[in-house]
Amino acid sequence: MHQGAPSWGRRWFVVWALLGLTLGVLVASAAPTSPGTPGVAAATQAANGGPATPAPPPLGAAPTGDPKPKKNKKPKNPTPPRPAGDNATVAAGHATLREHLRDIKAENTDANFYVCPPPTGATVVQFEQPRRCPTRPEGQNYTEGIAVVFKENIAPYKFKATMYYKDVTVSQVWFGHRYSQFMGIFEDRAPVPFEEVIDKINAKGVCRSTAKYVRNNLETTAFHRDDHETDMELKPANAATRTSRGWHTTDLKYNPSRVEAFHRYGTTVNCIVEEVDARSVYPYDEFVLATGDFVYMSPFYGYREGSHTEHTTYAADRFKQVDGFYARDLTTKARATAPTTRNLLTTPKFTVAWDWVPKRPSVCTMTKWQEVDEMLRSEYGGSFRFSSDAISTTFTTNLTEYPLSRVDLGDCIGKDARDAMDRIFARRYNATHIKVGQPQYYQANGGFLIAYQPLLSNTLAELYVREHLREQSRKPPNPTPPPPGASANASVERIKTTSSIEFARLQFTYNHIQRHVNDMLGRVAIAWCELQNHELTLWNEARKLNPNAIASVTVGRRVSARMLGDVMAVSTCVPVAADNVIVQNSMRISSRPGACYSRPLVSFRYEDQGPLVEGQLGENNELRLTRDAIEPCTVGHRRYFTFGGGYVYFEEYAYSHQLSRADITTVSTFIDLNITMLEDHEFVPLEVYTRHEIKDSGLLDYTEVQRRNQLHDLRFADIDTVIHADANAAMFAGLGAFFEGMGDLGRAVGKVVMGIVGGVVSAVSGVSSFMSNPFGALAVGLLVLAGLAAAFFAFRYVMRLQSNPMKALYPLTTKELKNPTNPDASGEGEEGGDFDEAKLAEAREMIRYMALVSAMERTEHKAKKKGTSALLSAKVTDMVMRKRRNTNYTQVPNKDGDADEDDL
């Protein structure tokens, strides 16, 4: 910021300059004046009453002594000749005046001067009276409080159910010699009767092996393993899921016994008990099980508390409700401690059971969405607007409350709202606020229900109570109560909530911007109006002091004015170019000692080539045609005058230097406009329904259905065990059935026979299996070859035995006979020459008796087999033969010859 007064260095410079000018004036007064010297004294003399002289050249002309003057060109404003008495020294001391003025004009080329003639009263004006300022637009009945926002409950009603059914599988198999082929598999599912569920499954943990069901209006019965009906124990499933358990009676499918080249049938009945999740959606007329099976009956149907009016599509004999039902855990066999009311329903495919509960308050069509600690309610026109910065939303509702009795199945709304409000109030407002009345309910656009609890600070509680009592006093003393059946007969409806909250976010944004802009514009309008009224009062007083300035500002252009009573007479001012105006350097009146001009003297032209007009510089660049602004000269005179776009500084009534407007400290007269910038606001993500809620809103969970269906075989069947067809199974089954029909003795004999037959079959099967092995076949082949070789050698031996028995039986003896080694024997033989006849006869007799002994043993053996008579006959024959055996034998001399040996 430039200071208006010159610095101390500049002041000392001005003092020395004035001293120099004073000495110059004294010297010049004694010296003759050169006739052509330019200066300002001529203008001063003319002002003192001397002859009028032309004005000095305009400020835009080139000064004397320009280093590069333009030749052969007539100046635009030629300098008039100066009188001979001009003070040349003073003019030389102030030679820089034009340059300073030229610099000021160059900095502010748009600064104009105006010549304002005195008004004659032909045109008069008056000021407008003060206006009534507008009021700031505001909402009405601003209320703070706690809010709980409810949305439509799209989540299904979930409960546990138990399925009872029997999987029936009938398989047709054709058996070949080396392979088996399924010709058809029939699978069906049959329900379990109520009596079996209660008396067998829940009471004992067993299930019958038969399945009775109706297909094509024909009752049929399936027997497990094609056998008689028995009780089978339920066992836990192989793989349990995270949300349910299961039990069943068998793992393996029953296949018929193997009979080659025949078609056989086998039946499997697997009793299954399975815990599943059930789901039902509004209006709860049906529910679906996790297996994908639909039940076309309301889960709240029953015979208690009027629940028989709920929806059902089944006949009465298919449904049964059991009071005081104690469920049993089929795994631990433990019985429940608390009884329940159990619903049982049989369908063509299964029987389902679940615990009955009343419809109210088990389900609710609305659910809590947001708890808002700070909710501002404002009234705009015919609606309420509930705004919250915490969730960046604005809800629009009617002015009337929404009765909860109109909400179908809305019992949870009041309870949940009160619990949430009490919790928020106790945590945050218990020490500073009080509750005003009961919670109020409003239905907002988009299907939201707002529970609102108005609050009031403790400091305003007393005032509010008085106001409330005043309002109550204005109401009728005995209001007409509603009819008794009004609430009961009111129609109920379900509130549908939109899935997007963007409209409320946009409404909040619009209200936020609207509130800010309206508040800002309201303050601007009020401040502007009040400022105008204030300025009007000031102008009415200021026009009396300076009517020209007030009239010029009011009209919007430069005019001259004077007061004619209570009105102003105005006249239009004529603009004069800044290049046609020059200020003189002295404000003293030479003809009147002690008198000085109060404002600088000027010379100007209306047009570029027009004559000079002498005048005086007025306020705000006004050129006065008169020079009557005179004042007594004072010591220490210092003045700043507006000249063009800047200021000229006169000290001791003489020009000193120029200043720009920036060198003068500015004091603002403007009133600050209180405009608050729009604050930043961040929007947080807000969802009405989460992805999990949307995914869970459907009646069917297809992922769960597919998972259960694909897991069914893994849970209730053994998929790893492989049963190979056995050709002997039919024989064993027949033998077993035969001996079973003979009682206990038959069963005992059957076990022995079955064991023996099983051993034989196992041995044969082992041999067959051994033969089917390549190594076994090789071993058998080698054994066969060995047997053939042994048979060949045995056949040779028999042939030798037939041809020469003694040589075959006694090969070494006959060999010694051919080659004797004993000399005595050799000599004796050589001497004897022939065999001993006695020994030869004795040998023959021995052979005959050996044959007789063999015949007798064979006869006795046969007699033992034939019986007693044959045995007696054999004994008699033996006695006869013994008598023949008593013949006396004598030793035969051993005289064998060589000829006999050759015969042998």
Curated annotation (Swiss-Prot):
Pfam families in alphabetical order: Glycoprot_B_PH1, Glycoprot_B_PH2, Glycoprotein_B
Residues with attached carbohydrate: N87, N141, N398, N430, N489, N674
Post-translational changes noted in the entry: The cytoplasmic tail is phosphorylated by the viral kinase US3. Phosphorylation may be linked to a down-regulation of gB expression on cell surface. ubiquitinated.
Keyword terms: Disulfide bond, Glycoprotein, Host cell membrane, Host endosome, Host Golgi apparatus, Host membrane, Host-virus interaction, Membrane, Phosphoprotein, Signal, Transmembrane, Transmembrane helix, Ubl conjugation, Viral attachment to host cell, Viral envelope protein, Virion, Virus entry into host cell
Gene Ontology biological process terms in this record: symbiont entry into host cell; virion attachment to host cell
Region of interest called Hydrophobic membrane proximal region, as start-end residue ranges on this chain: 719-772
Intravirion side: 796-904
Motif (Golgi targeting): 849-852
Membrane-spanning residues: 775-795
Major location category of this protein: virion
Source organism superkingdom: Viruses
Membrane topology: Single-pass type I membrane protein
Subcellular location: Virion membrane; Host cell membrane; Host endosome membrane; Host Golgi apparatus membrane
Location of the motif Internalization motif: 889-892
Residue ranges, compositional bias (Pro residues): 476-485
Region (Involved in fusion and/or binding to host membrane): 173-179, 258-265
Result of altering T887A: Defects in nuclear egress
Subunit structure: Homotrimer; disulfide-linked. Interacts with host receptor MYH9/NMMHC-IIA. Interacts with host receptor MYH10/NMMHC-IIB. Binds to heparan sulfate proteoglycans. Interacts with gH/gL heterodimer. Interacts with the host coreceptor PILRA.
Function: Envelope glycoprotein that forms spikes at the surface of virion envelope and binds to the host cell entry receptors MYH9/NMMHC-IIA and MYH10/NMMHC-IIB, promoting the virus entry into host cells. Essential for the initial attachment to heparan sulfate moieties of the host cell surface proteoglycans. Involved in fusion of viral and cellular membranes leading to virus entry into the host cell: following initial binding to its host cell entry receptors, membrane fusion is mediated by the fusion machinery composed at least of gB and the heterodimer gH/gL.
Family according to the record: Belongs to the herpesviridae glycoprotein B family.
Name of this chain's protein: Envelope glycoprotein B
Native species: Human herpesvirus 1 (strain KOS) (HHV-1)
Taxonomic lineage of the native organism: Viruses, Duplodnaviria, Heunggongvirae, Peploviricota, Herviviricetes
